[in-house]
């Protein structure tokens, strides 16, 4: 089993968890939670500007 990384926050996603989102161009994006999924797709937020994201620049 492969452990994937969240496309938004960079957290590790264990097998059987998370959301796999396939865009129209065929790219696969994986999200650890609905919070990450909605922030990326619906609101178009930049993960580097959010305090709760692990990928954030310090």
Swiss-Prot record:
Alphabetized NCBIfam families for the sequence: PRK14891.1-1
Family annotation (HAMAP family): Ribosomal_eL24
InterPro entries in alphabetical order: L24e/L24_sf, Ribosomal_eL24, Ribosomal_eL24-rel_arc, Ribosomal_eL24-rel_N, Ribosomal_eL24_CS, TRASH_dom
GO biological process, one term: translation
Cofactor: Zn(2+)
Gene name in the database record: rpl24e
Manner of cofactor binding, per the entry note: Binds 1 zinc ion per subunit.
Membership in a protein family: Belongs to the eukaryotic ribosomal protein eL24 family.
Pfam families listed in its UniProt record: Ribosomal_L24e
Descriptive protein name: Large ribosomal subunit protein eL24
Binding site for Zn(2+): 6, 9, 32, 36
Mapped zinc finger ranges (C4-type): 6-36
GO CC field: ribonucleoprotein complex; ribosome
PROSITE patterns attached to this UniProt entry: RIBOSOMAL_L24E
Subunit structure: Part of the 50S ribosomal subunit. Forms a cluster with proteins L3 and L14.
Presence of keyword Nucleotide-binding: no
One function term, GO molecular function aspect: structural constituent of ribosome
Function: Binds to the 23S rRNA.
Heme found in the keyword field: no
Entry keyword set: Metal-binding, Ribonucleoprotein, Ribosomal protein, RNA-binding, rRNA-binding, Zinc, Zinc-finger
């Amino acid at each position: 089993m492969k452990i994937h990384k969240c496309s938004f926050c960079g957290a590790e996603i264990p097998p059987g968890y998370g959301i796999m989102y396939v865009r129209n161009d065929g790219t696969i994006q994986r999200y650890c939670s609905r919070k990450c999924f909605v922030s990326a797709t619906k609101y178009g937020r930049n993960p580097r500007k959010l305090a709760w994201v692990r990928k954030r620049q310090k």
